[in-house]
Each structure stands twice: as C-alpha cells, then as structure tokens.
C-alpha cells in the first residue's frame, strides 16, 4: 500500500479519495496510460488544420518532443505496457489507437495524393514519428550521458529542428 499512499501524497489527495476514484491498482495504472495517450492525441491536433506536411508534421514533431521533455515518465510507462504485450490496455489499442491511426493515415495519404510529399507508407511514417520523438523520453538518460548532461533549452530546440528537417526532407516535403 506504500505505492498508493505515495501517489496520494504526491497528488495532494487523501488516500481514501484515491481508493474511491481508483478502486484497484489496475484502474489507476490504466488511467495513467490513458492520460499520456490523451496528451499525445491532443498534440496530433496540430496536424488537423495544416495545409500540408511541413506545417502539420512539423508542429506534431514539436509537440511530441516537448511532451517527451516535460512528461518523460508517461512515455516510459506507455512503452513498458506495450513491450509487455499491453495486458491492461490492449482493448484501447484495438479501438481508440486504431481509429486515431486510421484518421492520421487518411490525412497523410491526402497530402501524398496532393503531391505534397513522397509516396510512402503513412503507417510507417507514424511509427517513425513515434519512435523518434519518444526516444527523447524513453532514452533520456542515455542522451544525457552522451551529451554530458540533460539537454539545455537551446539543445532541445536544435534537436527539434534537426528531427523536423531530417523527417520532412526524408518524406520529400522539404527540398
């Protein structure tokens, strides 16, 4: 019970409230995993009204990398869950994530059909975007070790610019 007591203390809630809203550890864990996914979904809204991939994917990369910077533990929890076969959130992957992904694929395919980017597989672009942006959270310790310390604000900005340039050029959206 130390785990739940610690969470209640960090959240500034009485332990009884935590038990009321999350009767089991699985309920609490599921909510944590869903919350990081909801944060990522919100980040993807940057693509919705974009005229093309430079703006849409560029803003998405900025948002996802900022989330990796500000909420690295959320990404690590998500990665842990998925790497273990998603025992708690498999239904979420099969519904919410699948539907969301289909919508992003449709948008990216539209940009491809409009000649705004190379003919690539939209799903694999999404996988690459997720892997690249979440790497900065999931492997933050490795990056900090190789960098001689955590990335500074300027280094984060440079990383975002580099990632955007490499991906957008790689998909033929930048020349």
Name every feature range the model reports, one short phrase each.
Residues 3-27, 31:
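Helix-turn-helix
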Residues 15-18, 36-40, 44-52, 73-77, ...:
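Anionic, Ser/Thr-rich low-complexity intrinsically disordered regions
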Residues 69-91, 139-146:
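Amphipathic alpha-helical segments used for helix-helix packing
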């Amino acid at each position: 019970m130390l785990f739940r007591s610690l969470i209640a203390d960090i959240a500034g809630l009485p332990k009884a409230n935590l038990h009321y809203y999350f009767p089991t550890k699985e309920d609490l864990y599921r909510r944590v995993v869903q919350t990081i996914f909801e944060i990522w979904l919100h980040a993807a809204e940057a693509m919705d009204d974009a005229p093309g991939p430079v703006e849409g994917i560029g803003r998405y990369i900025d948002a996802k990398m900022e989330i990796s910077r500000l909420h690295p533990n959320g990404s690590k929890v998500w990665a842990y869950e998925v790497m273990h076969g998603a025992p708690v959130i498999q239904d979420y992957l099969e519904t919410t994530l699948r539907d969301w992904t289909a919508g992003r694929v449709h948008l990216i395919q539209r940009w491809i059909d409009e000649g705004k980017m190379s003919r690539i597989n939209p799903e694999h672009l999404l996988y690459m975007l997720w892997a690249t942006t979440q790497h900065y959270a999931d492997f933050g310790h490795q990056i900090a070790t190789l960098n001689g310390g955590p990335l500074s604000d300027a280094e984060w900005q440079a990383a975002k610019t580099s990632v955007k340039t490499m991906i957008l050029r790689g998909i033929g959206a930048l020349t």
